Regions:
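N-terminal catalytic or cofactor-binding beta/alpha core of small enzyme domains
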Residues: 1-114, 119-122, 131-142, 151-159
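Short, internal active-site loops enriched in acidic
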Residues: 124-126
Length: 159
């Protein structure tokens, strides 16, 4: 492994709460992070993210909005397993929407294997066309930033 940690924010800033990951990494970029940590905004460039991960990392933290049936604004940390390549599977890339599952599937199909992968997800309230986060998701930003900082410093967050 490379000894690096990658924190990647993904999402579409033109689909309201889908911009959650982008906003979290924007706020994180204003704060100090431990040595070896890269904080990047990948926006809707999930394919670029998958290729970046092929360089290897010990810890990968993906920050994104994800509909999980929770109350809007709920922040959840999940441990994610990168799937093994499936030669019989169809295409894993949807040019219009690359979900967290799609990013991990693409990474697996390319043979990428981060040491540990976490998803810091926020339940969206509104992913309609428009700019700006909904109230519940905007209010969740400080908690999400603290959560990622705790992950990076090895504090009490567990997946």
């Amino acid at each position: 492994m490379s000894g690096r940690t990658l924190v990647a924010g993904v999402g579409n800033v033109f689909l309201r709460d889908d911009a959650f990951g982008v906003e979290v990494v924007r706020l994180l970029a204003e704060r100090p992070v431990p040595d070896g940590v890269q904080v990047k905004d990948f926006g809707i460039r999930g394919v670029h993210l998958a290729y970046d991960l092929l360089d290897g990392c010990d810890l990968f933290v993906l920050v994104d909005a994800a509909q999980r049936g929770e109350t809007p604004g709920t922040v959840t940390v999940l441990e994610v397993e990168v799937p093994e390549p499936d030669p019989d599977a169809g295409p894993v890339i949807d040019a219009h929407s690359l979900t967290p599952d799609g990013i991990f599937a693409l990474l697996g199909s390319l043979g990428g294997r981060p040491g540990r992968s976490l998803l810091v997800a926020c339940e969206p309230a509104d992913v309609s066309a428009g700019m700006g986060l909904s109230g519940p998701v905007r209010e969740a930003l400080p908690h999400a930033v603290r959560t990622v900082q705790e992950i990076l410093t090895g504090e009490t967050v567990s997946a």
